[in-house]
From Swiss-Prot:
GO terms for biological process: imaginal disc-derived wing margin morphogenesis; intracellular protein transport; positive regulation of protein secretion; positive regulation of Wnt signaling pathway; regulation of intracellular protein transport; segment polarity determination; Wnt protein secretion; Wnt signaling pathway. It comes from Drosophila simulans (Fruit fly). Residues 541-556 have a biased composition (Polar residues). Residues 35-239, 292-311, 366-390, 463-482 are lumenal. The gene is wls. It is a multi-pass membrane protein. InterPro entries: WLS-like_TM (IPR047843), WLS_GOLD (IPR053936), Wntless (IPR009551). It comes from the Eukaryota. This is Protein wntless. One of its GO terms (cellular component) is neuromuscular junction. Pfam families: WLS-like_TM (PF06664), WLS_GOLD (PF21883). It is found in: Presynaptic cell membrane; Postsynaptic cell membrane; Cell membrane; Endoplasmic reticulum membrane.
C-alpha cells in the first residue's frame, strides 16, 4: 500500500513545503496591512431643508436637490421657527451624496460595491409642554425617495431608484433643555441598503407627513437636525481583495484536479476523507471565483446576498470537514464498514446545521427582501429585532458548542495517540521510527487546524464588526482590520491547499516482505537512509484495509500485528 504524501514525504521536502506556505501566509497579511485601506469608509451628510409645493407632494417623480443648476432654495431654521405650523407637510430633508471636496464634485466608484445609510434624528418640543422624557419606541413614519444620476447627466437629471413609506422606532434621550424648547437626540436607525453601487451620484428626499386622524408623527413635536451617515466599501480594499481572489483561484483549481487524478489512479473507491477534501476544495473555489468583476459592468443588487451565500456554503463545508477530519483520526474503528456522514457524524454536525440554517434564514429575511425594497430592515420593529437577535444568538450558541466539541474531539485524538505510543518500544526500530514520525506530523497538522479554526471565528467576528462599526482614526499607517481579513482569507486557501497536497495518495510503492524478515530489512533501510541527507518515513508493509488513506488510522491493528 502506498499511503499518503504526508506519510512518505521526506523531512527536507516537508520543511520546504511548510516554509513556503508560511511565507505565503505572511504575504497575505502584509498585502492587507500595507496596501489595503480600511474595508469600509463613510461620509456624514447634514440634511438640507427645502420647501415643496402642495401640488407636487404626491408626485414621486418630483425630486428636490440642494446643489447644481435648478437646486431648491434652502429654508433656514429661523424661517421654520417663525412659521406658526413649523411648515408641517411642506418640509423636505434633502441629502445629496457624495459631498464635494475642495470645491470639486466627487462621485462614487463601482469598486465601492455597496452603500448603507443610517440616520440620526433630533427633534424638539416647546418647553411649555408637560413632556420631559419621551416614551420608548416612538414610531416615526418616513416618506423616503431615493434617486440617482450618472456622470454626464444634467444637474436635474435625477431618476427615481426606490420609493417607500416606512416606519422606524426611536429611543431618545434629552440632549438640551432651553427656556423655549427641549431637544431630544435619538439612536441611529437603519435607513437603506444598496447591494450594488452602480451609479455616480445619489439623492435622498425624506418627508415626515403629519396626519391628525391617524396620529401620524404627532408625538414628535418638530424635527431639528437630521444627520445621514452613508457607509460604503472602500474601493482600494475591493481591489486588493479581488487581486487576492484572482491569484488564489487558479492554484486551488489546479491542486484539486491534481488531487482527484491521484485518487482515481488507485485501485479502490475514494475514502470519506478524500470526498470531504474535494468538497471542501469545491466550496473554496466557489468562494474564490471573482464574480465581483461583473459588478463593474452590470448592476447586480443581489451581489451582497450572493456573497453571503457563498461564504455560508464555505463555512458549512469547512466546519463539517473539521469534524470529519478529527473523527477519522480517532483511531477507533467501531465497525469494519466504510464511514459515511450519515452513519457516523449526523449527531456531531447538528450544531453546524442549526447555526447555518439560522444565519441563512436571517440573511434571506434581511437582504432577500432588500432586493425589492432597499428601505426594509428587519431591525426596524421591536418584534423583528427580537426575531433577528434570536437567530443570531442561536447561531452564536451553535458556534460555541461546535468549537468546544471540536476541541474535545482533538483532545480525544491526542489522548488515544498517547495511549498507543506506549506500544512503540515493543516494535521494531524501523516501525517505531515510522510511527513516531507520523505522530509528530499529525500532531503538528492538528494544532494548525485548531489555529485555523480560532482565526476563522475571529475573522468572522471582525467581518461583522466592519459592516456596522467604523474606525474614526484616519492617521493609522497599518490597518489591522484589513490585514486580518486578508490574512484569514489567505489562511483558508493555504490550509486547504496544504491538505490537498499532504493527503493526496502517494505513488511510492514499498516491497512486501514476510514478518520474520521485517526487522533485518528495515534496519538495512535505516542504515542506508542515515547516510543520506533525507530520512523518509516510509510506509511499511501492513495488513491494513486498502480503503484507509492514512496508516495512522490503522495504528491499533499494527500494534496487534507486532
Amino acid at each position: 500500500m502506498s499511503g499518503t504524501i504526508l506519510e512518505n514525504l521526506s523531512g527536507r521536502k516537508l520543511s520546504i513545503l511548510v516554509a513556503t506556505l508560511l511565507l505565503c501566509q505572511v504575504l497575505c497579511f502584509l498585502l492587507g496591512g500595507l496596501y489595503a485601506p480600511l474595508p469600509a469608509g463613510h461620509v456624514t451628510v447634514l440634511g438640507s431643508l427645502c420647501r415643496e409645493d402642495h401640488a407636487r407632494q404626491n408626485d414621486t417623480s418630483f425630486l428636490l436637490y440642494s446643489r447644481g443648476a435648478g437646486a431648491c432654495i434652502p429654508v433656514t431654521r429661523e424661517e421654520v421657527e417663525q412659521d406658526s405650523t413649523k411648515m408641517a407637510n411642506e418640509l423636505v430633508h434633502v441629502f445629496q451624496m457624495p459631498l464635494p471636496r475642495d470645491l470639486r464634485d466627487l462621485d462614487y466608484s463601482r469598486w465601492q460595491q455597496n452603500l448603507i445609510g443610517v440616520l440620526q434624528v433630533e427633534f424638539g418640543y416647546d418647553s411649555s409642554s408637560e413632556l420631559r422624557e419621551p416614551p420608548r419606541e416612538l414610531q416615526l413614519t418616513i416618506d423616503m425617495r431615493l434617486a440617482y444620476r450618472n456622470k454626464g447627466d444634467p444637474d436635474n437629471g435625477w431618476k427615481l431608484y426606490a420609493h417607500g413609506v416606512e416606519h422606524r422606532y426611536l429611543d431618545c434621550v434629552t440632549s438640551h433643555v432651553g427656556p423655549t424648547e427641549t431637544l431630544y437626540s435619538c439612536d441611529m436607525i437603519p435607513l437603506f441598503e444598496l447591494g450594488a453601487l452602480h451609479h455616480s451620484f445619489y439623492l435622498l428626499n425624506l418627508r415626515f407627513p403629519l396626519d391628525t386622524p391617524s396620529q401620524m408623527n404627532l408625538q414628535f413635536g418638530h424635527m431639528h437636525d437630521l444627520t445621514l451617515t452613508a457607509i460604503h466599501q472602500n474601493g482600494g480594499f475591493t481591489q486588493i481583495w479581488l487581486l487576492l481572489k484572482t491569484m488564489l483561484f487558479p492554484f486551488v483549481v489546479g491542486i484539486m484536479i491534481w488531487f482527484w487524478r491521484r485518487v482515481h489512479l488507485l485501485q479502490r473507491s475514494p475514502a470519506l476523507l478524500e470526498y470531504m477534501l474535494i468538497y471542501l476544495g469545491a466550496a473554496l473555489t466557489f468562494l474564490n471565483l471573482p464574480l465581483e468583476y461583473l459588478s463593474l459592468v452590470y448592476e447586480m443588487p443581489y451581489m451582497l446576498l450572493l456573497s453571503d451565500i457563498r461564504q455560508g456554503i464555505f463555512y458549512a463545508m469547512l466546519l463539517t470537514f473539521w469534524l470529519v477530519f478529527a473523527g477519522e483520526h480517532m483511531l477507533i474503528q467501531d465497525a469494519p464498514n466504510k464511514s459515511t456522514i450519515r452513519s457516523r457524524y449526523w449527531k456531531h454536525l447538528s450544531a453546524v446545521v442549526v447555526g447555518c440554517i439560522s444565519l441563512f434564514v436571517f440573511d434571506i429575511c434581511e437582504r432577500g427582501v432588500q432586493l425589492r425594497n432597499p428601505f426594509y430592515s428587519i431591525w426596524t420593529t421591536p418584534l423583528g429585532a427580537k426575531v433577528a437577535m434570536t437567530f443570531i444568538v442561536l447561531a452564536g450558541v451553535s458556534a460555541a458548542i461546535y468549537f468546544l466539541f471540536l476541541c474535545y474531539m482533538i483532545w480525544k485524538v491526542f489522548r488515544n495517540i498517547g495511549d498507543k505510543r506506549t506500544s512503540l518500544p515493543s516494535m521494531s526500530q524501523a516501525r517505531r521510527l515510522h510511527y513516531e514520525g507520523l505522530i509528530y506530523r499529525f500532531k503538528f497538522l492538528m494544532l494548525a487546524t485548531l489555529v485555523c479554526a480560532a482565526l476563522t471565528v475571529a475573522g468572522f467576528i471582525m467581518g461583522q464588526m466592519a459592516e456596522g462599526q467604523w474606525d474614526w482614526n484616519d492617521n493609522v499607517a497599518i490597518q489591522p482590520t484589513s490585514a486580518f481579513l486578508t490574512g484569514v482569507y489567505g489562511m483558508w486557501n493555504i490550509y486547504i491547499f496544504a491538505l490537498l497536497i499532504l493527503y493526496a495518495p502517494s505513488h511510492k510503492q514499498w516491497p512486501t516482505m514476510h514478518h520474520s524478515d521485517e526487522t533485518t530489512q528495515s534496519n538495512e533501510n535505516i542504515v542506508a537512509s542515515a547516510a543520506s541527507e533525507e530520512i523518509e518515513f516510509s510506509h511499511l508493509p501492513s495488513d491494513s484495509n486498502p480503503s484507509e488513506i492514512s496508516s495512522l488510522t490503522s495504528f491499533t491493528r499494527k500494534v496487534a500485528f507486532d
